[in-house]
């Protein structure tokens, strides 16, 4: 493949450097949910952790494949990562809703539960992005599509 923003090397880098976070949260959520039950502790912690992991994933992916978006600034990448993290939290809740509706599961326990999950996912994403700004590398130090 070529050297474009979505070439094979970029895909491999995303898999190696970014995918592990969300995958780890999903695996921990499945195991901890089975061991301890999802409510009242595992589910909230995992939604927050999911927000952290998704913000990490989207920030790394947008940095690695930055050519796809032009030449975004670090703020641009952070804003894109935040928006995509919020979208991921929203679509996760849609999945829970439709699972309850069509598969007869009882994952969502009401509006309060859904709003809590959205708030925790968003908060996890915000915390990651702020922490990455404080302790992370500067824009010039980021390995953007080398």
Regions found by a protein language model. Give the residues of each.
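Short aromatic-rich membrane-water interface segments that cap or initiate transmembrane helices
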Residues: 109-117
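Bulky hydrophobic segments
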Residues: 1-110, 122-146
């Amino acid at each position: 493949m070529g050297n474009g923003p979505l070439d094979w090397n970029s895909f491999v880098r995303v898999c190696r450097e970014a995918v592990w976070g969300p995958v780890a949260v999903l695996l921990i959520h499945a195991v901890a949910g089975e061991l301890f039950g999802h409510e009242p502790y595992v589910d909230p912690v995992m939604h927050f952790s999911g927000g952290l992991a998704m913000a990490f994933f989207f920030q790394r992916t947008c940095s690695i494949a930055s050519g796809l978006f032009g030449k975004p600034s670090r703020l641009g990448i952070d804003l894109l990562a935040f928006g995509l993290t919020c979208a991921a939290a929203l679509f996760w809740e849609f999945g829970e809703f439709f699972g309850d509706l069509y598969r007869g599961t009882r994952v969502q326990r009401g509006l309060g539960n859904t709003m809590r999950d959205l708030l925790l996912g968003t908060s996890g994403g915000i915390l990651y992005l702020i922490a990455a700004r404080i302790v992370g590398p500067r824009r010039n130090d980021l390995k953007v599509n080398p």
